[in-house]
Swiss-Prot record:
Site (Important for tRNA non-discrimination): H33
Family according to the record: Belongs to the class-II aminoacyl-tRNA synthetase family. Type 1 subfamily.
Organism: Wolbachia sp. subsp. Drosophila simulans (strain wRi)
InterPro entries: Aa-tRNA-synt_II (IPR004364), aa-tRNA-synth_II (IPR006195), aa-tRNA-synth_II/BPL/LPL (IPR045864), Asp-tRNA-ligase_1 (IPR004524), Asp-tRNA-ligase_1_N (IPR047089), Asp/Asn-tRNA-synth_IIb (IPR002312), AspRS_core (IPR047090), GAD-like_sf (IPR004115)
Positions annotated to bind ATP: R233, D234, E235, E497, G549, V550, D551, R552
EC numbers on record: 6.1.1.23
A single GO molecular function term of this UniProt record: aspartate-tRNA(Asn) ligase activity
Name of the protein this chain belongs to: Aspartate--tRNA(Asp/Asn) ligase
Annotated segments matching region Aspartate: 211-214
Amino acid sequence: MNCYKTHTCNELRKNDVEKEVTLSGWLYRKRDHGNLIFVDLRDFYGITQLVFNNDKDFFDEISNLKLESVITVTGIVEARTEDTVNSSISTGEIEVIVNNLRVESEVEFHFDEEIAKEERSILASITGEQEYPENMRFKYRFLDLRREKVRNNIILRSQIIAELRKLMIERGFLEIQTPILTASSPEGARDYLVPSRLNPGKFYALPQAPQIFKQLLMVSGFDKYFQIAPCFRDEDARADRSPGEFYQLDLEMSFVTQEDIFQIIESTLYRVFAKFSRKSVDKDFPRITYKEAMLKYGSDKPDLRNPLLISDVTEIFRDSGFNIFKSNIERGMVVRAIPAPKTAEEPRSFFDKKIEHAQKEFGAKGLGYITFDKDGTAKGPIAKFLDENRLNHIREATNIEPGDSVFFASDKENEAANIAGKVRTLLGSELSLIDDNIFKFCWIIDFPYFVYDDKSKKIDFFHNPFSMPHGGLKDLEDKNPLDILAYQYDLVCNGIELSSGAIRNNKLDIMYKAFAIAGYSRGEVDTRFGALVRAFRFGVPPHGGIAPGVDRIVMLLADEPNIREVICFPMNQQGEDVLMGAPSKVEDKHLRELSLKVIE
C-alpha cells in the first residue's frame, strides 16, 4: 500500500463516505473558522476539502503552516451538507475529517526580506491567478507551473504530442532519432556552436533541423520517417517564436509528390485540431501560390479569417491626375488597394490614425484613401484627381459597396505588398472582421527558388537549398534564376506559419548547378555537404518532407497569444533562462580544456 495516498485529490465521491483515506498534496487554501480550519488540499489531479477540528493536537500546527507546504493526512470521508456542496470541483460533495497530519515539506521564505517579499507575491499568484512580470514568473517557474492555467497548457502539450506520435505510427511512419551534435549547415539562421575538447579549434553545431539526416534516411531505404525533433536556432524572440530551442514534427517520405505530403499533413492536423479545440476547423486547405499570396494578402502567411483582399490598381493610376502615384509608377513602383468596409462615414481622425500608424509601425511613406458615400459619391484627398471612369475601375477592382472606403499603398512591389498586408491585418482587427472561433488553414506553394540579395549584391537561395526546382536541370540552365520556382511549401493557420517543407532535389547535377547559381563552387558543395554528395552517388529515391512546429500548434490550440506560455521551461525575450541562470560564464580551466579564450 502506498504510504502517501490511497486516493488522489480528484477521486473521492459520495460512495466513499465513512472510508478511511490517506491523501497527500499541497496546502492550497486555508479558512480559519475558530474551532474548525478548512483546507483545500491540491495535488496534480484535483482538490479535496479537509476539515481540522481544534480538539486535535496538530490543530496549531496546521493553523500556522504556510500555504503551498506539502502534507500527508489520514481521515474519514464525510458527506457535505446540501448547503455546503461545492459544484465547482469534482469532489465537492464530500470532505475529509482529518485524524492525522504529517508535514512532508514546509515553505520557508528567504532570510533576505526583499527576496522574501518577491517569493510571497509569486506564491500568492498560485491561488489568485494574477499575472506577474515574465522574468519573475520564469525565475520561479516551479511555482508558476502550479497555476492551473499554466499547468493545463503543459498537459495539453503532452496530449498533443502523444496524438501526433500515434497518428504518425498509424500511417506507417518509423520514429527515428537523429544526432544532436552535428555539423553547421546553411538553414538561414545562426547556429549554436559546441566546442570539441578532443578536436581543438573545431566545433559541433546543434541542428537547426534534421534536414540532411532525414534525407540520408531516405537514401538508406527507409520509406517513412518521423520524430518529435528538438531544433536550435540563434534567433530573436517573437510572440510565435521562442529563442533558442523549439520542437517540430519532423517527417520525410520516399516516392511521393507534393500532394502526397499535403494529404498526410491535412488529415493529421485536422484530427488534432478537431480533437483538442472547441473552435470549428475548416476542412478546406486551399493552395495559394506565393505570388498570389503576396498580391492578395500582402503576406506569405495570410490569415484567411480576414475577408479583406488586396488589389493591384497600378494600371488605374497610370497616367492619372494624381501625380504622386503617377510618378511612382513611372519609376517602376506599384499601387495596392485595401478595402475598408462600412467606414465611409467615419470621421477624418479615423483615416489620419491609420496613416500615422502605417508610417510609424509599418515604415510606410504614407497612405492614400478614398471614401465612397452611400450615394456612391467619391471623396477624400485622392478622389478629386480621378475621373469617374477610373473611380468605377477602383470600385470593380476592390469589390466595394456604397459606404465603403479604400486605402492605397504605393512603393516598390515588395514594400507595397508588405505595407498593404499589414494595413489589411490592422483593418481586419479594428473593424472586427476576424472570426476568432475558427481555424483556417492554407498551403503557400510555388515559392521562388532564388532571390537577389541587395546587401551582398548576389543571388541566393530564397528558402531551402535542397528542394527540387520546377523544370529541373533544364530550367536551371535556361531560365533567369529569379524566374525559377521551387517545389517548396508552407502550411499556414490563422496567419501563423506552422511548417515549411519541400520535395527534395534527388539529383547530383541539379544540386551542383543550383549551388553554382548561388555562388558556391563544386568544391565548396563537396566540403559543406560531403555526406549528402556521397549519398547522392548511390541511388536516391524521389522524396519530400515537412516539419510542423509543435510549439506553434500547441499555442494555437491553447489559445495563447505567446508561444512561451506553452513551453515548460521557456527562455525570456533576451534568450536567458532566468531559472537556471543560463547563459553563464564558465571557469577558465574549462575554457582551456576546450582551447577557448574569452575576448572581453
